[in-house]
Swiss-Prot record:
Gene Ontology molecular function, alphabetical: (3R)-hydroxyacyl-[acyl-carrier-protein] dehydratase activity
Main localization of the protein described in the UniProt heading: cytoplasm
Gene3D superfamilies with a match to the protein in the record: Hotdog Thioesterase
Catalyzed reactions per annotation: a (3R)-hydroxyacyl-[ACP] = a (2E)-enoyl-[ACP] + H2O
Disulfide bridges in this chain: none
Active site: 58
Protein's recorded name: 3-hydroxyacyl-[acyl-carrier-protein] dehydratase FabZ
Membrane-traversing stretches: none
Summary of the function given for this chain in its UniProt record: Involved in unsaturated fatty acids biosynthesis. Catalyzes the dehydration of short chain beta-hydroxyacyl-ACPs and long chain saturated and unsaturated beta-hydroxyacyl-ACPs.
Compartments (UniProt record): Cytoplasm
Family in the record: Belongs to the thioester dehydratase family. FabZ subfamily.
Family annotation (InterPro entries): FabA_FabZ (IPR013114), FabZ (IPR010084), HotDog_dom_sf (IPR029069)
A GO cellular component entry from the record: membrane
Length: 152
């Protein structure tokens, strides 16, 4: 699939996202991109359902989305920004670090995460940093900075 595949309305379907990111079930954690400003920002949705495998053990009597999966969702949105930058080399950008991540509210089955990532920097065409936030019903549930690195 062509690296530059955003439609005219700057949105991506789940099928198009699968063409950009290597993640597959159960780690494909972005359902749709609803806004994209190339090279700067992406806003995406993750619908959280009780059918997801993590809820069998986290926690059966009070299911909560693990914080690490919220961060991974934000990282995947950041990965979409990086893959859509025309001046960067093609290849696999992997999640390389996090800074200042804060979890503010639980995320429950039935919630819809609205994830916003903004590009902060690109260095030597190999390293990227984004600021990410995840909201549910307009309330901030998680925020932090995420780093990416191009794998040779």
């Amino acid at each position: 699939m062509d690296k530059q595949l955003l439609s005219e309305n700057n949105q991506l379907s789940s099928e198009e996202i699968l063409g950009l990111l290597p993640h597959r079930f159960p780690f494909a954690l972005v359902d749709r991109v609803i806004e994209h400003i190339p090279g700067h920002k992406a806003v995406a949705l993750k619908n959280v359902t009780i059918n997801e495998p993590q809820f069998q053990g986290h926690f059966p009597e009070r299911p909560l989305m693990p914080g690490v999966l919220i961060v991974e969702s934000m990282a995947q949105v950041g990965g979409i920004i990086v893959t859509q930058m025309p001046d960067l080399p093609k290849g696999l950008f992997v999640f390389a670090g996090i800074n200042n991540v804060k979890f503010r509210r639980p995320v429950l089955p039935g919630d819809q995460l609205v994830i916003t990532c903004e590009l902060l920097s690109i260095k030597r065409q190999r390293f990227g940093k984004v600021k990410g936030e995840a909201h549910v019903d307009g309330k901030l549930v998680c925020s932090g900075e995420l780093m990416f690195s191009l794998v040779d």
